[in-house]
Curated annotation (Swiss-Prot):
It comes from Kluyveromyces lactis (strain ATCC 8585 / CBS 2359 / DSM 70799 / NBRC 1267 / NRRL Y-1140 / WM37) (Yeast). GO terms for biological process: proteolysis. Its EC number is 3.-.-.-. One of its GO terms (molecular function) is metallopeptidase activity. This is Probable metalloprotease ARX1. Keywords: Cytoplasm, Hydrolase, Metal-binding, Metalloprotease, Nucleus, Protease. Probable metalloprotease involved in proper assembly of pre-ribosomal particles during the biogenesis of the 60S ribosomal subunit. Accompanies the pre-60S particles to the cytoplasm. It is found in: Cytoplasm; Nucleus. GO terms for cellular component: cytoplasm; nucleus. InterPro entries: Creatinase/aminopeptidase-like (IPR036005), PA2G4/ARX1 (IPR047113). Component of the nucleoplasmic and cytoplasmic pre-60S ribosomal particles. Belongs to the peptidase M24 family.
Amino acid sequence: MALQISKEDTQVLLKDKNVLIEPTIEKYRTAGQIAQTALNFLISLINKMYHEKSMEPLPIHQLCLLTDSFIADCLSTKFNNKVNEKGISMPTCIDIDEINENWCPEVDDIENLSRWNQKSRSTKSIELCNGVTSSLSGFLKVGDVAKITLGCHIDGYTCNVSHTVVIYPTVQDAQSGKLLPEAALLGGKADALAATHIAVESVTNLLAAANDLTKLPADFNATKVTGSLIRTVVDTIAQSYNCCVVPGSRIRRIKRFLSGQNENIIVERDFKGVIWTESHQEAAMLARTVNETAVDVKRKNPFITEDTVVPTDDFTVVKGEVYMIDLKLAPLQGLEPGLITLHTVDQFSGKSESSDVVARPGAICRDFSKSHVLKLRAARQVLTRLDKQGVYPTKLAHIADSFPLDVQEPDFETIKQEIKPFRLGLSEISNNYLTIDRDVTIVKHVPWAKILDLTNPSGVSSYDAMAKNKGLYPGFELPLPKLGLSNLQLKSLLKKHSTPVPVVRQCVTVAICDEELLRISGNLKSNWVHSVYSMDTASNIVAGIFKLAQLSEDKRFGLKIRETQPWKMKF
């Protein structure tokens, strides 16, 4: 369904409203302050429960709901009667180890998760992966790597943030008597944490260099910041630390109400960003194994415009743009050469494989391109409440009358009772495709030896919404287009020959202003880790990365980067 609007409205909505003037920057800055304050609030709760042990641990679903309530309370104090919309842009998610994203169960799903997964058993992995076990139990364990993701928006100007927290074993200090981490994190998880932190910092510095191209190091052999240069920098860092960029990672430009939350619904014609998919791993594998130097020459068709919906690296970063850096890396330690891909968790029980996890998506997103006359009164009431939430993902708990909860004395039972009638209405809404589920995904590894045994030139799997629905654009219909492996074949391999792999995530939002780069979110310190890997300084790309890091520390002649600080609050 395509919505026809005038050219004047298009100019206002997509151009004028995204100019980085002072009121717009202030909305981004305020959203960043609230997001970072909420992140500090949740991290402080986790530290008190598992490191300081000064309070009883709360289940994951309660931690998520408390953080969402904290964000809603903070938003209620800003821009009142000045903006039409403000709210949560991403429900708080706590994804542990191999769980990739979107783990934010509702308060009424805890008993269901235990019942649905009674027969599930843990699978072997390269390193201890307790993500599924910890998530089903609802509590974190020592050694878990928890990825916290949340976000908010003010008038459509969005700030999402992700940070990874490590649950350390603690020992009591002899002098102070406080509980301190026993030792640094080692192994593959430490490699991924170090690589992710360095990659995000390097890309941030690279985007800051777009303000003053004279400070772009000559080692990159580039005169401007392009998508291909960004991909090269991230891939170089990942390879140096023996890691792989997980499919779905992205560095993309965001606009008002367009922060990548509806990529399966909305087709963005003016898309700018770097996207990592399985096909990039396939191309890298073939480049290493096939002794060919031939290069495919793509001739430009004069009858085809540059207006495309397929993500490409052929773009240039310029001033006045806002970018979201969302990187997820998985370690390759102890793995044979293979493919890192995503396995979607669904809510269908009665599967033949007892190791399959059954979970219902907690986050849903309203598809405003579809309409339907609903029969149930409960469905119409739920749809009315969902329409008020806007285009961003939400939860049933967010539309309850008792939300937001009192952070000091939360009443989870009341909101649990309110959600029960919403379930009936949501069933009819989702059956008529008025909402889209934000599926929970798990990162898994499949050996190339098993993949090469299969081939099938059919199947549809794409990143882009239009290509996914219409089967357009050769190369994007298949996860592995050159090998001809279909999506169904890949799913069969995931059931028989896959291994769960831990993943680390970090997401920040930056704005390239006229004189400086404004770091809207993501200035938290990295975890205490020790990695056995380091980057090769003989490489030109690595040398350029180090020079950018030095320029970022030079406050006088270096890169001009300003950070948005969270609110000073005692938790």
